[in-house]
């Protein structure tokens, strides 16, 4: 059985005045990973480095983004592989604090940052999942809470406008989805 993470997370680590922000994302495909990378590079334009690694299905990639070769991307990739995860992108954004860490220090810092991010992410078995979309009226929080608290639903994303739009991945035979289909409100579950 393959493991993946259930939700996107981030953690901050400071070492010798350098700030390392570790992000972990669930990614269905490489295109999704590239979109996250583009988003983070735009968000952290003043960062010294945006290093990453991913394992997505049979695809693996690691980038040191200007750090000495093998000191950033590979340690991140090793953390993903050690935990036997798939469909995961880890990005570590570094803001240089003025003190050089040396090659060994960089390996430890990037590895620790990746570990911190993954430690805060719950894991789940990766099954053949179906993507669902759900639009809720404000006030239907019980439905929202049942989704948030369900261990078999992952990659939960929210968008707030006149309704609460939710997309997520789940096994289409999941019991909580059957209860969503019979709610008497205007909740509509759509298979994407």
Map each language-model feature to its residues.
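C-terminal regulatory domains involved in ligand/effector binding and gene-expression control
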Residues: 1-71, 157, 182-192
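Short Cys/His-based metal-binding microdomains
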Residues: 101
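Short glycine-/aliphatic-rich beta-strand segments at the starts of folded cytosolic domains
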Residues: 123-138, 166-167
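Long, charge-dense
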Residues: 106, 110-129
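N-terminal positively charged helical leader segments and presequences
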Residues: 161-164
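Short amphipathic alpha-helix segments
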Residues: 134-153, 177
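Terminal, non-globular segments
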Residues: 168-177
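Glycine- and acidic-rich phosphate- and metal-coordinating loops
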Residues: 54-55, 86-96
């Amino acid at each position: 059985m393959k493991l993946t993470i259930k939700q996107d997370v981030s953690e901050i680590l400071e070492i010798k005045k350098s700030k390392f922000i570790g992000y972990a994302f669930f990614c269905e495909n490489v295109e999704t990973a590239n979109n996250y990378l583009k988003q983070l590079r735009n968000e952290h334009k003043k960062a010294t480095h945006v290093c990453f690694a991913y394992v997505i299905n049979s695809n693996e990639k690691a980038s040191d983004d200007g750090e000495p070769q093998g000191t950033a991307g590979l340690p991140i990739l090793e953390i993903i592989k050690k935990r036997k995860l798939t469909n995961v992108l880890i990005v570590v954004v570094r803001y240089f604090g003025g003190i050089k860490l040396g090659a060994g220090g960089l390996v430890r810092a990037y590895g620790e940052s990746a570990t911190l991010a993954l430690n805060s992410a719950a894991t789940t078995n990766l099954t053949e999942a179906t993507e669902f979309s759900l639009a809720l009226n404000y006030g239907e929080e019980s439905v929202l809470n049942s989704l948030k608290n369900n261990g078999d639903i992952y990659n939960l994303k929210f968008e707030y406008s006149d309704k609460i739009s939710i997309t997520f991945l789940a096994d289409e035979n999941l019991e909580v989805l059957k209860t969503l289909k019979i709610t008497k409100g205007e909740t509509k579950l759509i298979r994407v």
